[in-house]
Amino acid sequence: MSAQQLILDDIMRTTVSPYEELLAYEYLYSRKGESLKKLSDATVKKGILPSYLLKERAGLFGVEGDYGKMTAYIDSKLGKCSFVVNGAYGWPEKLKDSARPAPVLYYRGDLGLVESKNVSIVGAREASDAGMSRAHAAAKKLIGADVTIVTGLAKGVDTAAAKAVAQSNGKGRIIGVIGTPIDEYYPRENRQLQDWVAERNLLLSQVPFYKYKIQPFTSKRNYFPERNELMAAVSDATVVVEASDRSGVLHQAKACLRMGRPLFIMRSCAENPAVSWPSRFIGKPGVQILDDISQVLEAISA
């Protein structure tokens, strides 16, 4: 057990209400200029909890007026989801490999699914018909091997993989990881699918309720690269079906390399002359061109 975990375990034995940690996290995150990386560095990576950091910084800003307003807003959300505090009982072991682990994780469904054998199937939102077909077929084969599918529930490849689970007659399992608060829907046309994922298996988010509410719309896009990093941490391997040179999927590919998680690039994508990004990954440790799902199954069973 790491020194960081020993510190966190000691803190958890001597304090805290998870609810107070949630409020502290939400409030700290709502401050101007705050980010997941900054909060992760100041809390999880130093072995302290959000409430301790809030006490340290209390003299830097007032915590009465807007703290109460924030608390009322958070309270209105809590009946719709559950949450777990990093370092507390129930935090998924697999997520400790993340480069910037969130202090709090929001979820709907069975959090224990994170510890199952999981594979992300990711790719373009505006996917080709062939890409959609490949995503669906890959998911179907993984379901047949008792592997949980991880998806970002975006349009295109993500949706094709999710629908393979929905059409599996109850045999498949799915984890949806979203880049909005746990009770928001993006894209809106996937609302029914997202609710189905949450009710049947597991939906995850690390996006704070209050900051999301008050921040400018244009800054909300930053949550999606962080979502992809969380997907990499949740997954034992990632399969890229197709993606452009500017795709957000590349954030997940880079995270796989950092965490030592296997990354598979479908051959149709790797040999696509219209994109150059695969050449930056192919040949690096843990990266394979995917010809058959058996390669993925071998990698995650090793």
List PLM regions with ranges:
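Short, small/acidic-rich helices and loops at N termini and domain boundaries
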Residues: 1-89
